[in-house]
Amino acid sequence: VKASDPIAIAMDIDAAGLPFLKNLTPPAGSKTVEELRDIVRLAEKPFIVKGIMTPKGALKAVEAGASAIVVSNHGGRVQGCTPATAEVLPSIAKAVKGRVKIFVDGGIRSGVDVFKAIALGADGELIGRPVVPFIYAEGAEGFRVYMDRIVSQLRDTMNMCGTPSLADIGEDNIFIAK
């Protein structure tokens, strides 16, 4: 991995129970802050911890030295009873905002979804599955078309909500059911 000189290294912490990760040596599973800190140190690059679903988990990642976290539940495939990332994002952002970059995935399908995620505390959003058909059909051009649509939708939403910049987007721009 180091030979490829990546800009960052990430570790997925919430998939240890998936069938293809069983019987690994060393075993996949929970890591203490100290173990995670050792991994971060060995990376020698900005380190991203993916699979954060609680403020406690986010604080552990910060304590271990992570540069960023990804609020992610693998689309509920790891445990079907996990909440949506949008439900937990505000409390996680409240716990660690400004100390680490906060990314979110899961359910991001449009520029409106990107707007909502920013309003809930994300610094950035990860989109995977929805873009695959565009890339499969048209390669890099398909990716560009998809991303242009997301950006256009985000700009339209920002204009409709009176938010001239990403920094102006906040919880007061969206309705949160209690």
What are these regions (language model features)?
Residues 103-105, 169-170:
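Beta-strand segments within the central parallel beta-sheet cores of soluble alpha/beta enzyme folds
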Residues 131-132, 138-178:
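C-terminal extensions of enzymes
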Residues 1-104, 111-134, 176:
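Alpha/beta enzyme core
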